[in-house]
């Protein structure tokens, strides 16, 4: 299998008011929900955290990687993790997208071998979504982008060898729509909606 997953669990969670990773979700926390769902599809799982030890009490078989800088955002977390993972690349996803189907991650992973970045050709509404396979070849570009304070999805995709997969391919491997898979739990109202959707079995994968 030889696949690596990084779940981005850091950030200040200012809109939520508490750590998203530890929000109750079904009978576990949100990060545990994602971990359990993706574990059968990945050999190695890392947790990107603000500080080492943030999620140790969950006793997951996953190595924590603290951010290089607390204020560097998701791209700082990606950079931190790429410098620490054992393999040459990893699939990155945010902890606030718990409805993503693991088969979607596998779809990208299988098409990432000869590229620095493999992600979806998102529409404008999802243009800031962090979801894709990033290779260690991105490290230099990430450093430059952060130094000059202009790092973004568009910046990275322009500077790196990027493979953009059409989102329509999701339909061939998953019964969960793209809109559902990339639904973001980023504030209280979206969290409550997600919890009730689980109870009603609206989002299941």
In which residue ranges do the predicted regions lie?
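A short, conserved alpha-helix in the catalytic core of glycosyltransferases
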Residues: 154-159, 192-193
């Amino acid at each position: 299998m030889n696949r690596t997953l990084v779940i981005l669990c850091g950030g200040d969670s200012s809109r939520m008011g508490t750590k998203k990773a530890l929000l109750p979700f079904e009978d576990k926390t949100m990060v545990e929900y994602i971990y359990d769902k993706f574990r059968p599809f990945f050999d190695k799982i890392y947790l990107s955290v603000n500080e080492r030890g943030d999620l140790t009490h969950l006793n997951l078989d996953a190595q924590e990687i603290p951010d290089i800088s607390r204020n560097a955002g998701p791209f700082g977390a990606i950079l931190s993790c790429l410098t620490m993972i054992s393999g040459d690349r990893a699939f990155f996803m945010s902890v606030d997208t718990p409805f993503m189907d693991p088969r979607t991650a596998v779809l990208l992973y299988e098409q990432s071998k000869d590229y620095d970045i493999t992600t979806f050709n998102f529409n404008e509404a999802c243009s800031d979504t962090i979801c894709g396979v990033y290779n260690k070849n991105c490290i230099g570009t990430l450093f430059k982008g952060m130094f000059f304070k202009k790092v973004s999805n568009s910046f990275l995709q322009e500077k790196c060898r990027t493979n953009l997969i059409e989102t329509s391919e999701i339909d061939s491997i998953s019964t969960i729509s793209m809109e559902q898979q990339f639904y973001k739990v980023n504030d209280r109202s979206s969290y409550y909606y997600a919890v009730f959707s689980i109870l009603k079995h609206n989002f299941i994968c």
